A protein has these predicted regions:
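A short helix-loop-beta-strand connector motif used in the catalytic cores of GNAT acetyltransferases and
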Residues: 37-58
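Acyl-donor-binding surface of acyltransferase catalytic domains
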Residues: 55-60, 65-143
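A generic alpha-helix structural signal
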Residues: 17-20, 34, 86-87, 111, ...
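Short amphipathic alpha-helix that is part of the acyltransferase structural core
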Residues: 1-30, 136-158
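A general structural signal for well-ordered secondary-structure junctions
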Residues: 25-26, 43, 96, 120
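Exposed alpha-helical structural elements
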Residues: 11, 15, 29-33, 81-85, ...
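A short, aromatic/hydrophobic, helix- or strand-capping loop or linear motif
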Residues: 26-36, 101
Length: 158
């Protein structure tokens, strides 16, 4: 298992794109930022941190940060070994993280590792929810026919 960093957003997406798309519901923020970076958008003066942990052909953790903004994580919260590689790399690089985005179990696990490395005490600043469509229900067609609006419909239109 190793931490792999990327010099360009295109190389990053080539490697982690399939992983992110497979978990699109939870990785939409990370994926959106990466796609904007590929298109040439800049979020600050510093180069972005683009990384994944590789383990036997899989990416259990994907990380992205556009300084000075928060770290964004996607992956398996149970893989403390993989999260530890990300935390160790950032701590040894002297990074000061203002925050971490991701699923609560993932950010909690990372926060504990980060606290052990840096002494920074993590806290939840803003809880958010993400909804994912898992099933589409079809509905019956509406009965009726189209018609032009008339003056008697004014209250419905205005």
């Amino acid at each position: 298992m190793n931490l792999r960093t990327f010099s360009t957003p295109a190389l990053f997406l080539d490697c982690v794109g399939p992983t992110l798309l497979a978990r699109e519901g939870e990785s939409s923020l990370l994926l959106g930022i990466a796609l904007r970076l590929v298109d040439g958008h800049s979020y600050g003066d510093e180069a972005p941190f683009l990384a994944c942990v590789e383990d036997e052909g899989r990416c259990p953790v994907v990380a992205l940060r556009t300084p000075p903004f928060n770290l964004t994580l996607c992956g398996d919260a149970g893989r403390l070994d993989a999260l530890s590689l990300v935390a160790d790399h950032l701590a040894h690089a002297g990074c000061s993280l203002p925050g971490v985005h991701g699923r609560i179990d993932l950010t909690d696990s990372f926060g504990s590792l980060w606290q052990a490395l840096t002494g920074a005490v993590p806290r939840i600043c803003q809880g958010q929810r993400l909804y994912q469509l898992t099933e589409v229900a079809t509905s019956a067609s509406a009965v009726g026919r189209p018609r032009w609006a008339e003056s008697r419909d004014a209250a419905l239109l205005a």
